[in-house]
Amino acid sequence: MYTYMEYLQKCFYKSTNWNEDNIYSNITATSQALLDFPIPNGFKIDSSSKTTDYSASSFTLSNHHQINGSLAYLYSSIPLTNTMGTKDVSLQDAIAGFRIIEPSVGLSSKLTNNIIQNRSSLLYGRMYFPGSALEAMIIKRITKNSQLLIKCVNNPHLEKNGTMIVYLQNNTAKYSRELIYSTNEALIGLRCLYNLGNDATSHNFPHVNPAVIPKFDNSVISIGTELWYAARTMSPGLSAALRYSTRSTSTGKPLTMTLAINPIVGHISSTYTVKTSVASTFCSKYDFNVFSYASNLSLGFELYSYANKKKNTFPSFEHHEIYSSSEENKYLKKHPELQRHHRVPIKSHKYQGNRTIINPIQNLDNVYHINPTLLSSTTNSPTNNDNSNTSETVTAAFQNLVNESDFSSVFKFSTSLNDKVVKILWEGRLKDFLVSTGVKLSLNPITNTPEFNKLGISFSYAL
């Protein structure tokens, strides 16, 4: 679960149209959210308030080993009007989970002029007690595609009482580049990420027979690398990663595959993540070292539950002009009286007068039945007669259904076969609070008995 300050930072990025998924450090963010999610340790309570559209404050208190806490402040040069408190915020925005990667869309001229004129910036600071530890962050937009990010930590337990990291980032639709400097070990880094893919697959085939249009659209291949050099110790660093994201036009379900390589230490990591339904996601990760031949398999999933479990409010595509999903069909078979007004036909998508089939499927059920008549180029097709409304693609409807779903909680589970670790996490809404509780279990290598590594609960409240 994001802290309130992290949530405001993401809202700031959305307001300024900054694509976080286009940054190299986030290339494996989806698998990390499903496999490496943090477990609360002890008791923690977080109370936050956005006093104005430009500023917010947060107070945190916990009892991990001892009573400690922190006080944080945040200021934004642009109004953060797209934020919500814990009572109204959707769990999709408050909890790290599956990220649907799609081609970036350029800024509108109105928003671009506004951003360039204001030179948007964000200031953040946090003070910890007891003790004298401080942390700060500055985000300064230089142009519409570049920004300066500075992170500082002051702690008497660190070497030279602290460290500072400076990021100079350039983020466009096709690529992103980062130049990084850290005072720790005089570390210098360079990160690059390039996107290979089409912004709109269907628009690139206006003169091609619709029958041969690929069954996947919005596919994006991202290739990135990072280079590091520690000047003080003269130590190099290198890694490369690849991410493939796509969404099936038959079901609308997205999937993401990644491959990360560190040639210096010989480590290879591959992940496969798929959103199996609107409320569930599955992820697998395989690690292998070419030098030691050590390997590890990690599995994880997340399962959302709906806030209202009444049968008449079962989530459906009835407001989206596509056919029902398999889960809805199971429900409709038990209630035949609802089938009459439930389904609506798939309408063809028109592009410059040439009909392009987005999803040539009719009678979508647990078994898909392809309708060859939809693949015909005949202009007298029944699907062309009704042009009163513009239907959306299955991929867009699935994404909209995920965004519009009212979830009350999410259950996360992950395990690692080689490490013999099990993590269980529950996050949800309790009255006006967001609650996160979980446990981390591991197998004692000597006694072969399970033992608790972490166990805790945290409450978050924000106005």
Swiss-Prot record:
Q: What is its main location?
A: mitochondrion
Q: How does it sit in the membrane?
A: Multi-pass membrane protein
Set out the biological process GO terms recorded for this chain's protein. Answer: establishment of mitochondrion localization; mitochondrial genome maintenance; mitochondrial outer membrane translocase complex assembly; mitochondrion-endoplasmic reticulum membrane tethering; phospholipid transport; protein insertion into mitochondrial outer membrane
Q: Name one Pfam family in it.
A: MDM10
Its subcellular locations are: Mitochondrion outer membrane
Keywords from the UniProt entry: Membrane, Mitochondrion, Mitochondrion outer membrane, Transmembrane, Transmembrane beta strand
InterPro entries recorded for this chain?
Mdm10 (IPR027539)
GO CC, any one term: ERMES complex
Task: Describe the task this protein carries out.
Answer: Component of the ERMES/MDM complex, which serves as a molecular tether to connect the endoplasmic reticulum and mitochondria. Components of this complex are involved in the control of mitochondrial shape and protein biogenesis and may function in phospholipid exchange. MDM10 is involved in the late assembly steps of the general translocase of the mitochondrial outer membrane (TOM complex). Functions in the TOM40-specific route of the assembly of outer membrane beta-barrel proteins, including the association of TOM40 with the receptor TOM22 and small TOM proteins.
Q: What is known of its domains?
A: Lacks alpha-helical transmembrane segments, suggesting that it resides in the membrane via beta-sheet conformations similar to those predicted for other outer membrane proteins and porin.
Under the subunit heading, UniProt states: Component of the ER-mitochondria encounter structure (ERMES) or MDM complex, composed of MMM1, MDM10, MDM12 and MDM34. Associates with the mitochondrial outer membrane sorting assembly machinery SAM(core) complex.
Q: Which family does it belong to?
A: Belongs to the MDM10 family.
Q: What is this protein called?
A: Mitochondrial distribution and morphology protein 10
Q: Which gene encodes it?
A: MDM10
